[in-house]
Design a protein with these regions (language model features):
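Short helix-to-coil transition segments within interhelical loops
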Residues: 128-158
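N-terminal signal-anchor/first transmembrane alpha helix
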Residues: 1-12
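Periplasmic/extracellular loop-to-transmembrane helix junction in inner-membrane transport proteins
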Residues: 14-56
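Glycine-rich helix-loop "coupling/hinge" segments at transmembrane-helix boundaries
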Residues: 99-100, 128, 175-189
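Generic hydrophobic transmembrane alpha-helix motif, especially the helices
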Residues: 83-119, 126-127
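Transmembrane-helix boundary motif in ABC transporter permease subunits
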Residues: 52-82, 99
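Transmembrane alpha-helices
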Residues: 110, 114, 147-180
């Protein structure tokens, strides 16, 4: 990578490429260091949108997944809506959310929630359903209630699935925050 930066610097200077078109790495790093306060302030805004949106998305997704898991009839009506919600590009919803909620942090957090909600709920619900049936039968034979089975077997078993959904959602939440800021924001990356 260091060699690429040196090559880039030499070629830009040797070919007299305009700085506005392709600035040399030395100029980029110089600007980064001289503007670190501004960049850090904007980073904090984006970071706040991502973290708050991701936490709210996880809380909402876990609660809806639990409701769907316990009420099987709801799965037939809610799950298709969840899948259909993923067909709408978030970038088309961004201007609407901006108009409805204003150009503040709330509209960006809602975009993050929308974009990161689906992988969390799908993975957590899959984890709840994937518990070995033999383990559940054995727990019932030992006298465990449905609530005990849920909290002591199914939730811990679904934790790796939840973490997998959070990994996917954490990447997409950054994309959601940046898209929201791109459509309309006064601060953020």
């Amino acid at each position: 990578i260091f060699i690429l930066f040196i090559l880039w610097e030499v070629l830009v200077r040797a070919l007299n490429v305009e700085e506005w078109f392709l600035p040399p790495p030395s100029l980029i790093f110089n600007e980064l260091f001289s503007s670190y306060k501004i960049i850090f302030d904007h980073f904090l805004t984006t970071f706040t949108e991502v973290v708050v949106g991701l936490i709210l998305s996880a809380v909402i997704a876990i609660n809806i997944a639990i409701v769907i898991f316990f009420f099987k009839n709801l799965e037939k009506s809610i799950y298709p809506l969840l899948i259909a919600s993923q067909t709408i590009p978030v970038i088309t919803l961004s201007p609407l959310l901006l108009v409805w909620f204003g150009p503040n942090i709330l509209s960006k957090i809602i975009i993050v929630i929308i974009i990161s909600f689906f992988p969390i709920i799908v993975n957590f619900l899959d984890g709840l359903k994937s518990v070995d049936a033999e383990m559940i039968k054995m727990s019932e034979q030992f006298g465990a209630s449905k609530l005990q089975i849920f909290y002591k077997i199914q939730v811990p078993y679904s934790f790796p699935y939840f973490i997998s959904g959070m990994k996917i959602a954490s990447v997409s939440s950054v994309i959601g925050a940046v898209v929201g800021e791109w459509v309309g924001a006064s601060s953020g990356l």
